């Protein structure tokens, strides 16, 4: 993962996630030993509950879910030590309980394009709560004429580097049994880390404009945006 980020000039993400060069090897080998960036794939319910309890104590976590909600990445961590946890519907017993837990009001979340996420959660009968910041909306408020606020564009706009393409983890078979998980995992984790990095960058700029946060400002732009939050 370090070599992939280095190749893409992810200097800020390398620092953010606490990556190091580690032993030589391909992306696949480094992702199998994800410890360099303290990331993990959660397959045990006890570990799931432990992480949910931890996140309830934090002021926020960054969350990115695939459109089907079958895969979720959560990023958090202290100074210079990013951490990531990956959850997959076909690998975690009680996955729906995880979704209810992570999208509960007790866990404060930073997300990208909260409105679309809320629609998907509501369609699955889940109550989307606890969103405290939307990086897509924040980017719109700061540059309303840009036209596109996709993560791939924002990484170039604000940090002058390119992240892996979202299609790497959005493909229907990206995490299938016959797929090589290295590339989609790297893309999903880097996009989630980028959400956190954007939050750290955009929130102070919104404060300078006198806005308390992207979520609060949403009500003035779209009355339906914050419904059920």
Label each region the model flagged.
Residues 33-35, 70, 74-210, 219-229:
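Active-site-proximal helix-loop-helix substrate-binding element of RNase H-like nuclease domains
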Residues 212-214:
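Extended, non-catalytic structural segments that build the interaction scaffolds
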Residues 2-5, 40, 143, 183, ...:
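A general boundary/transition motif marking the beginning of the first structured unit of a protein
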Residues 1-73, 77-104, 108:
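Long, highly charged low-complexity segments
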């Amino acid at each position: 993962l370090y070599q992939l980020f280095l190749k893409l000039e992810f200097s800020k993400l390398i620092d953010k996630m606490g990556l190091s060069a580690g032993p030589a090897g391909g992306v696949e080998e480094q992702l199998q030993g994800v410890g360099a960036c303290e990331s993990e794939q959660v397959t045990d319910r006890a570990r799931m509950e432990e992480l949910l309890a931890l996140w309830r104590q934090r002021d926020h976590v960054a969350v990115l879910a695939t459109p089907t909600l079958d895969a979720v990445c959560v990023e958090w961590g202290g100074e210079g030590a990013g951490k990531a946890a990956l959850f997959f519907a076909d690998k975690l017993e009680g996955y729906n309980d995880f979704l209810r837990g992570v999208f509960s009001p007790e866990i404060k979340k930073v997300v990208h394009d909260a409105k679309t996420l809320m629609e998907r959660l509501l369609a699955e009968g889940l109550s989307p709560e606890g969103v405290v910041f939307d990086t897509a909306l924040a980017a719109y408020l700061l540059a309303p004429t840009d036209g596109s606020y996709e993560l791939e564009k924002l990484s170039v706009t604000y940090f002058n580097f390119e992240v892996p393409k979202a299609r790497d983890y959005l493909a229907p078979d990206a995490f299938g049994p016959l797929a090589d998980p290295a590339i989609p995992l790297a893309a999903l984790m880097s996009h989630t880390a980028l959400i956190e990095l954007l939050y750290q960058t955009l929130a102070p700029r919104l404060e300078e404009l006198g806005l308390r946060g992207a979520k609060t400002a949403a009500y003035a732009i779209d009355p339906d945006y914050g419904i059920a939050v």
